[in-house]
Amino acid sequence: MEVSILIVTKNRPDELEITLNKLFGLLDLSIHEVLVFIDGCKKTEVLIAKYPWVHWENSAISISASPARNKLYKKAKGKIFIGLDDDAHPLNTNFITISEKLFKELPKVGILAFEEIKGIFNSDTDVLTLKQDVLQEYLCSEFVGCGFAIRKDVYEITNGFPVWVDIYGEESCLSMEVLAKGYDILYTNRITVNHRINRAQRMQTRRNYYRFGKQLKNTTFYYLVYYPFPLFKIAKLFWHNFKKYACSDWKYFKTYFKALFAIVLFLPRLIPYRNPIDAITLEKISQLPNPKF
């Protein structure tokens, strides 16, 4: 198997169908495989019979995004793993060929971070009107989870997607481990994905509060796991979020302290995963730009 396309899904069967339908015509199933993990979602299970060419993994209860990715990626057989969100699809018909070519030409690149265009459009042609014609490629500090590629052999020398993160922040953890192993992350707009999200709707459904709490907790865990001396970083993180968010909004305030409580409770279970990165590598990583998103 040459390439594995991997998707974790929860509560978005309609979006997943769009993605699978977009992918089907772009694949050679003799050398490409699609694996989908259903994270505790009964209404998505009806798609299993409809898409027999997909390799399905199903959890009766939700285990959350990062642990689900950890389980799913262990099942993949391709030499290259391509990760997509369930509501994201590639706009390039030759996205697999481009990924293979870049990995062949650049042996020190472990991850390709694809260009992301957010929004809901009438057609892929409309999306592509927003794409820049100028080639943009540079080494960066991490990747965005809605669209990326990683070499299987590189993924397997890391701990994979962390089981100590639930959702939001798992890409930063995998990026850290890949960079610490001496591989690079290349941002490239040769491959573009349309991330079909409605920003205004997500804000109206208050997903920002949910994300705030998860990111505060998981960023704390990130520092505790990877930094030799994390307390200063954590203190700055707490103070910044207290001033900017918790003091400005009652719901942010409650979410802030709920996250702190969750951190304290989980701390004994986090200790076995501690894997400090040396200071030289951390400094090098801190000098890298973020990918465009």
What name fits each language-model region?
Residues 20-58:
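Acidic donor-binding segment of Leloir-type glycosyltransferases
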Residues 59-76:
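Glycine-rich, basic loop-to-helix element that forms the pyrophosphate-binding segment
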Residues 81:
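Short aromatic/hydrophobic "clamp" motif used to bind/position activated sugar donors
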Residues 89-124:
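Conserved donor NDP-sugar-binding/catalytic core segment of glycosyltransferases
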Residues 118-120, 133-150, 166-167, 172:
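A recurrent flexible, glycine/aromatic-enriched loop bordering the glycosyltransferase active site
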Residues 193, 203-233, 254-268:
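Catalytic core of nucleotide-sugar-dependent glycosyltransferases
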Residues 229-293:
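Non-catalytic, C-terminal membrane-associated alpha-helical segments of glycosyltransferases
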